Amino acid sequence: MRVSPQSRLTLVFILITVFLDIVGLGIILPVLPGLIRELTHESVTNAAVIGGYLVFVYASMQFFFSPILGNLSDRWGRRPILLLSLVGLSLDYLIMAWAPTLLWLFVGRILSGICGAAMGTATAYVADITPKEKRSQRFGLIGAAFGLGFIVGPVIGGELGEFGPRAPFYLAAALAAANVVFGFFVLPESLSKFRRRRFNWKRANPFGALWAFRHAPVIFVLLGALFLFSLAGQTYPNVWNFFTIEEFGWGPAQVGRSLAIFGILFAISQALLVGFATRYLGVTATVIIGLSLAAVAFIGVSMIHTELGLWTFLVIGSFSGIAAPALTGLLANNARDNQQGELQGAVNASNSLTAIIAPLAATQLFSFFTDNPLRPITFPGAPFFAAGLIVAAAMALFIFAAIKFDLRHRPFDERREKPRYPQPSGQAVNPPETEIPEDEDGNGDEAEAEAPATKN
């Protein structure tokens, strides 16, 4: 099947859109402390608390608006949602560059979270235009654009941040605006009117996907382990900038470069090491090794006082990236084929929850143990120490699941034949169809054909 030039251009647009969204998230990390302090004249620790609230607002908007925008795109099409979200992102970057008060920073983060929630629509667009046999490859390109954006974003933010904390946002605004113009001319609608369905608030509920697996203990427990691991992992983007400024006196450029190096090594571990580890060590061992590396890295970063030691533990932590894909693979292998979409929705909802909880918890810990008069000790690394304990809890939960549900040391594909659900004696291994709730109209996940309205 030959790919038309138009199809190539639309795919390029989608990849640029995902890339710019993540670049916008990464840009703010190195310059956020300086921008907050410029507006508030607060100390680094107080700026960290404010930064936590800003990230909390952003993550909350993404969590609640992702399913809403996804369902709106099912009703009105992908093109308008994507183009409007890019217009909103461009406006957000201009607001962040201009913001005369802290209130306007919050306005910008709210707008960014809402518009960034449309990235799920970008994935849906790729699914619309791609044959089933090529979807994994195309989704891999989206993942690559995501990873590249997180690497490039902190570098741009750090380097341009040397000219002032607002400088990176002007570049981001210009790039987003240029992509709007590009998309206006090259992006056709991918969802025909006959494949659309009515907007439904039940489908737009972000908690629905998690609740759907309450009767599948093995998946619920593994989701719990993944939730804890992801919660700990949020410490890096939320506290690393404030921690390195306070403890080592780093500037925006050093913060940006360190996050970029971490992102590169983390991506390498996920792209190259996961397959090797699961093939020769098994999935269970791979998860345990990855969690162990994460726990050691977090505890080490919290205790170390030299830059050499900091870089050493940062490198160790980057290789913990093998844990999440292996754990996600175990989750997928313990769900039925027609539950994979629901499962990934639950995983995304879980990750979004960690992005809401972690900013407040981590920055409050950092502030308390750095300059609060009631602190028992001065310990700027407290959030990383807490993250190490959380990873240890995730490991304990995973080991419990491995023993309880017999998650043996096997590569992913060897377990696909036996989804593990509790079954009454004499019943099939697969769970009944009623486990995953249907839409209110009883159509499940099937699209409703557009037709003239009729009344009974």
Positions of the model-derived regions?
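Juxtamembrane intracellular "pre-TM" segments in multi-pass secondary transporters
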Residues: 2-7, 188-224, 247, 417-425, ...
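Multi-pass alpha-helical transporter architecture, strongest
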Residues: 180-186, 385-423
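Conserved MFS/SLC helix-loop-helix module at the cytosolic interface between two early adjacent transmembrane helices
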Residues: 63-102
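C-terminal transmembrane helical hairpin of 12-TM major facilitator-type secondary transporters
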Residues: 284-327
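Cytoplasmic helix-loop-helix junction between adjacent transmembrane helices
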Residues: 108-147
